[in-house]
Design a protein with these regions (language model features):
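Selective for proline/serine-rich intrinsically disordered segments
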Residues: 4, 14, 49, 73, ...
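N-terminal domain-onset segments
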Residues: 1-70, 97, 191, 198-214
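Short, surface-exposed coil-to-beta transition loops
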Residues: 70-72, 85
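Solvent-exposed, well-ordered amphipathic alpha-helical segments
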Residues: 36-48, 75-79, 118, 123
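Internal, well-folded beta-alpha domain core
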Residues: 29, 61-63, 77-214
Length: 214
């Protein structure tokens, strides 16, 4: 059983099998963040959290399962020395990627349709939800190196934790967002937010490990 919101629920289990991590990939992306809504905490993990919502649209130009697009969001961040995402909503347009997310990282991936350019106007549409972004990059292109950690709740109170490490180039951006869905409309704020665009990058998502608590 995966920790998820209704937009990422999926009863299907016969997805094509994906290779194990690490998953290296070339990426372009738009990321944005905002102060969490009053309702966001009920869709986040238990334990200490920070009231910051982090979301992103990602274009994987290549990967172990081929090219695909992705949208994901964390309603709040886990409070830690380095804050971590907890992702109850994530969708892709690759069946093997759905398998990989669910099997290797406990990420509740579902299938969706994508259109546009992540560095400009982009959209993701599922069965009963949609997210649209318009990224407006500003300022110079700068180098970036770091990682994003996600820690997914699993039965028994533990979490499954993994890190995606990135090296590439980015620009500051203002990202305008519209979201519809039974829960997305309650915690993914519409409007224009601070963000960045990854204009080019190499990313590698490593194997997850179970930790007793965060």
């Amino acid at each position: 059983v995966l920790w998820t919101v209704p937009e990422s629920e999926d009863e299907r289990t016969d997805y094509p099998v994906s290779p194990p991590p690490p998953w290296p990939a070339s990426v372009r992306a738009a990321l944005w963040w905002h102060r969490s809504t009053p309702d966001a905490s009920q869709y986040g993990p238990t334990g200490a959290t920070l009231p910051i919502t982090l979301a992103m649209m990602v274009d994987y130009l290549d990967s172990p399962v081929g090219p695909y697009r992705e949208v994901l969001a964390s309603p709040v961040l886990r409070r830690d020395l380095i804050p971590a995402m907890a992702v109850p909503f994530i969708a892709v347009d690759s069946e093997p990627s759905v398998h990989g997310g669910r099997e290797h990282w406990k990420l509740p991936k579902v299938l969706a349709k994508f259109d546009g350019d992540v560095l400009g106007d982009f959209s993701a549409t599922g069965a009963r939800w949609s997210v649209a972004t318009s990224a407006a990059p500003k300022g110079p292109e700068l180098p970036v190196a770091g990682g994003l950690t996600f820690a997914q709740p699993i039965p028994g109170g533990a979490v499954e934790r993994a890190t995606a490490r990135l090296r590439g180039k980015f620009r500051y951006a203002r990202v305008t967002v519209a979201a519809e869905g039974s829960t997305l409309s309650r915690w993914l704020r519409p409007g224009t937010h601070h963000g960045i665009v990854i204009t080019s990058g190499r990313m590698s998502t490593g194997a997850s490990r179970v930790v007793s608590r965060m």
